[in-house]
Design a protein with these regions (language model features):
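Extracellular beta-strand/beta-solenoid scaffold signature
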Residues: 5-10, 40-65, 88-108, 130-157, ...
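N-terminal targeting/docking segments
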Residues: 10-16, 161
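Right-handed parallel beta-helix
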Residues: 19, 23-28, 70-81, 110-126, ...
Length: 172
């Protein structure tokens, strides 16, 4: 199956005993998610970075987004996010949309556990080549500053596995 102009955003969790598994079932080719610049969400580190020229907040397009989720397995998918059809958007445009194939984000729930990315084919993810601190590229795993850090603690990960993934033709 090809999911053209579609994306997957997971903002819920499985459990250690019963993780959420997203992947192929049955026979045939791997399902392909072609986000085409869709799946837009807002990234905010929560604090300015060390240089005023470094972008620390803005919109990102992700074909697959795991946001504050845990105990998730994403496997055996083909993922693209190139959006060639956006008129006037070219490779070195300074305000080009940031894009990822897969973005994994921890922010407001403390420690996130059990994230597995396995046997993913990620290609043709063409985002902004300048915003080096924004989620931008094939696979991007980020911990952002929580809104209520005094309550949730620092956002971070434990037990993350990325294996057997092949990433090519991405702009960052």
């Amino acid at each position: 199956s090809v999911f053209y102009g579609q994306y997957l955003q997971v903002m819920d969790s499985g459990s250690k005993e019963a993780p959420i598994v997203i992947g192929v079932y049955g026979e045939g080719d791997a399902p392909r998610i072609e986000a085409c610049g869709q799946g837009i969400w807002y990234q905010n580190y929560g604090t300015p970075l060390d240089s005023p020229t470094h972008v620390y907040h803005g919109y990102v397009s992700s074909a697959v987004l795991l946001y504050d989720a845990e105990y998730i397995i994403v496997e055996d998918l083909e993922i693209t996010n190139d959006a060639d059809e956006i008129i006037g958007e070219y490779y070195s445009l300074g305000d080009k949309m940031n894009r990822t194939g897969v973005a994994v984000v921890a922010k407001d729930k403390g420690v996130r556990h059990g994230i597995t990315l396995r046997n993913l084919l990620i290609h043709d993810v063409n985002g902004n080549v300048y915003d080096k601190h924004m989620n931008n590229g094939g696979i991007y795993i980020t911990a952002l500053r929580p809104e209520h850090e005094d309550v949730t603690g620092v956002a971070r990960y434990q037990d993350v596995t990325v294996e057997g993934c092949f990433v090519y033709q991405v702009s960052r």
